Design a protein with these regions (language model features):
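Accessory alpha-helical/coil subdomains and C-terminal extensions
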Residues: 87-90, 112-196, 203
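Short glycine/serine/threonine-rich phosphate/pyrophosphate-binding segments
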Residues: 33-37, 74-75
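Glycine-rich oxoanion-binding loops at beta->alpha junctions
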Residues: 1-21, 63, 68-69
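A glycine/threonine-rich phosphate-anchoring loop and its flanking beta-alpha core
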Residues: 56, 62-128
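A glycine- and small-aliphatic-rich helix-loop capping segment at beta-alpha/alpha-beta transitions
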Residues: 39-50, 82-86, 111
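Short, acidic/small-residue loops that bind anionic groups at enzyme active sites
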Residues: 41-66
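Solvent-exposed alpha-helices and their adjacent loops that cap or buttress functional pockets
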Residues: 15-21, 27-28, 64, 73, ...
Length: 210
């Protein structure tokens, strides 16, 4: 929303004037994409919001949503990290994406972007969405540009869905509760996923918790 837009601008302001003697520590977690909102040049804020809403409603997995977000943002896809130069940068990541790809958590604001503009265009085409002209013009105008942002930085994954599930499983079993862990790779529209999980619960042993 507008608050996220203002916050992203202020964040970039804090990074001005850094030197190579400075150290920037970033804490990035799932949900950061929605909070860190600053559209790329020539994309109205409402158009970026519209694209995000359409991708969520059509059931696109978070990996695809974040791939598109990275190419429509002035801070995602490594651009926040590039703004930290020439300072040293270390990112602490709490991952909510299957596989814990750091470039996808919160759309990787401090991690070099490994996806291409053509990837974002392919995702939008696959779902046959009515994309605002400003977004299409921005993406098509970037296709021939060299992909990726080069800067030096390090990162550590300090928490993830997988470690959270294992901790919950261990805690439950320590209290005599038998559980079934479905893993951290489940993606899709919550309504559909919820139905699938409910069916599984009904089939499971009554003494187990899912």
């Amino acid at each position: 929303d507008e608050a996220g837009l203002t916050a992203a601008g202020r964040m970039l302001g804090y990074l001005e004037g850094l030197t190579k003697e400075d150290l920037v520590l970033c804490l990035i977690s799932g949900g950061g994409s929605a909070l860190l909102t600053l559209p790329a040049d020539n994309i109205p804020f409402k158009d970026k919001q519209m694209v995000n809403e359409m991708l969520v409603k059509c059931g696109a997995p978070i990996s695809e949503i974040n791939t598109v977000r990275k190419h429509l943002s002035a801070v995602k896809g490594g651009r926040l990290g590039q703004s930290c130069m020439p300072a040293r940068l270390h990112t602490l990541i709490i991952s909510d994406v299957p596989g814990d790809d750091p470039s996808l958590v919160a759309s990787g604001p401090t991690i070099p972007n490994t996806s291409k503009v053509s990837d974002a265009l392919a995702i939008l085409k696959n779902y046959d969405l009515s994309i605002p002209s400003s977004v299409l013009e921005h993406l098509k105008g970037k296709v021939e540009e060299k992909e990726g942002l080069s800067f030096f930085g390090t990162h550590s994954i300090i928490g993830s869905s997988k470690t959270s599930l294992e901790a919950a499983k261990s805690h439950a079993r320590n209290h005599g509760i038998e559980v079934t862990v479905l893993g951290d790779a489940i993606e899709g529209e919550s309504r559909v996923v919820g139905q699938n999980v409910a069916q599984l619960v009904l089939r499971e042993n009554k003494q187990k918790h899912v």
